[in-house]
């Protein structure tokens, strides 16, 4: 039996030696599938619909009623959830070398790969060879704007495959200028905790991206910038947001606003951030404080016949009546807007303070300037004027028709508490009418910010309850500055209007929020 086993094993061994060996299977040929995309310059690291920067985040409780005063992570190159804008105004870092572009070899097959990049000037650069693995198949490079040819070479042993794609590297430089309706006043990053947990005499610490200006990425321009960023992987968006609560044309946009700690005009602040880069898009909200927004509210809260009364304080002090002051200040707006236009790609720029005499900011070919009309905060859900606290419905109607309506009649009939009719001539038009008229400057007025609330059958004013798009009086609720400003719903409506006015149009889905 043992002899048979030995003989059998010998026969098997001889058979194995005598059979020809199967040829080794040839390695699969490599395939090159080059792809590219712009790395976002307006980042949303947690998908909550708001930009996250690199300016630091509270060490604890960022979105609570009272976040930690200690900030962490500033300048580490990582956008943390709920992290402030860089310097309170910049979405991400600008680099003279260009903008970050992701080169994607992940759908390719092979062992190793390199990219060869031929730039707009014809210069060629080849990246270091890397292993083609899931963790290493992506490469980020800095490239200047313009047309590039990207060639991906993939190798396996001595075999290789190369394919090229054209890449139009493009970063949209967006600048937000203006007042509280642009800065996001009343909408700090932790606004939701204030809305749900705050109350009468509550203790609340707003978490702003910029404290002096009450600036927040919950403001409409920042929301629109993020929507623009997310609209295409082939462009990135850098936001420079210098809007500041309380700003006017002279004290804010074109000059220092020392009352809010701004030693330089917004124009000069932008210049120092972007240098000689060309701007692609400007959003602008200004004029409300120029015509006496705060003075009107103060007067009408204390005087039942405020339009014919003497302004108690503020920018309209010295005018014989509130109506006369509003009309006189409205008449100054066309020249004020023209001065701003001079600084945005015009022939001369007249700013005061630091930067006086500097050249205008450079605008890119086809750049858009989007001034926003102010929303209607005066009407109840029924469409009737609000009768709010000590402000009479008649005075709400007067404010709406003589300040906000963009196509007013030539006169306005006002009825006093004594039932005495007074006819007001509107020779200077209205604030929103003057903003709409900036088409003459080559601007594109954002009318949707008005029409959504002002032309609708349903009112969304300060007395509209759950349908309101603006805060009422918040003086006793821990954030007095929010009074009579757009609430989160109102900022979203303005952001939607801004995005819709962009070319090409950008749509913000409510599901994104």
Task: Label each PLM-derived region with a short phrase.
Residues 94-108, 116-119, 161-190, 217, ...:
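Mobile, glycine-rich extracellular loop/lid and propeptide segments
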Residues 220-237, 329-370, 407-448:
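A structural motif corresponding to the C-terminal end of an alpha-helix
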Residues 374-508:
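Catalytic His-Asp segment of secreted/periplasmic serine-dependent ester chemistry enzymes
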């Amino acid at each position: 039996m043992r002899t048979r086993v030995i003989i059998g094993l010998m026969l098997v061994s001889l058979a194995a030696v005598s059979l020809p060996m199967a040829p080794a299977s040839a390695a699969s040929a490599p395939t090159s599938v080059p792809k590219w995309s712009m790395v976002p310059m307006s980042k949303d690291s947690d998908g909550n619909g708001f930009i996250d920067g690199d300016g630091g985040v509270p060490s604890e409780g960022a979105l609570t009623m009272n976040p930690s005063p200690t900030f962490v992570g500033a300048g580490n190159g990582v956008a943390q959830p709920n992290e402030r804008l860089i310097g309170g105004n910049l979405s991400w870092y600008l680099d003279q070398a260009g903008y970050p572009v992701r080169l994607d070899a992940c759908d390719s097959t092979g062992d190793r790969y390199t990219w060869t990049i031929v730039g707009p000037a014809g210069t060629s650069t080849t990246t270091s060879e890397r292993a083609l693995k899931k963790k290493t198949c992506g490469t980020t490079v800095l490239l200047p704007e313009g047309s590039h040819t990207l060639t991906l070479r993939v190798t396996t042993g001595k075999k290789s495959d190369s394919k090229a794609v054209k890449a139009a590297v493009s970063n949209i430089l967006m600048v937000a200028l203006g007042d509280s309706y642009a800065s996001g006043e009343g909408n700090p990053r932790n606004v939701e905790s204030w809305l749900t947990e705050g109350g009468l005499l509550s203790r609340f610490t707003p978490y702003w991206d910029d404290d002096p200006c009450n600036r927040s990425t919950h403001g409409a321009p920042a929301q629109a910038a993020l929507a623009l960023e997310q609209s295409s992987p082939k462009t990135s968006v850098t936001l420079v947001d210098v809007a500041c609560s309380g700003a006017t044309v002279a004290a804010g946009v074109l000059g220092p606003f020392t009352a809010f700690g701004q030693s330089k005009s917004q124009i000069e602040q932008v210049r120092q951030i972007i240098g000689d880069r060309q701007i692609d898009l400007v959003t602008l909200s200004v004029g409300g404080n120029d015509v006496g927004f705060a003075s009107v509210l103060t007067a009408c809260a204390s005087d039942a016949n405020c339009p014919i009364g003497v302004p108690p304080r503020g920018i309209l002090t010295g005018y014989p009546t509130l109506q006369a002051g509003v009309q006189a200040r409205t008449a100054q707006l066309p020249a004020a807007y023209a001065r701003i236009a001079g600084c945005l790609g015009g022939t001369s720029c007249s700013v005061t303070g630091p930067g006086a005499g500097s050249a205008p900011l450079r605008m890119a070919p086809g750049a858009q300037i989007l001034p926003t009309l102010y929303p209607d905060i005066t009407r109840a859900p029924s469409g009737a004027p609000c009768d709010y606290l000590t402000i009479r419905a008649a005075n709400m109607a007067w404010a709406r028709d003589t300040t906000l309506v963009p196509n007013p009649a030539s006169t306005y009939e006002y009825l006093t508490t004594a039932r005495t009719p007074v006819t007001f001539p509107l020779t200077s038009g209205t604030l929103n009418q003057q903003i709409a008229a900036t088409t003459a400057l080559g601007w594109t007025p954002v009318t949707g910010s008005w029409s959504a609330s002002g032309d609708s059958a349903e009112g969304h004013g300060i007395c509209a309850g759950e349908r309101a798009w603006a805060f009422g009086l918040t003086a006793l609720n821990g954030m007095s500055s929010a009074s009579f400003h757009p609430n989160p719903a109102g900022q979203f409506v303005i952001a939607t209007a801004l995005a819709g006015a962009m070319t090409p149009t950008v749509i913000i889905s409510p599901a994104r929020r």
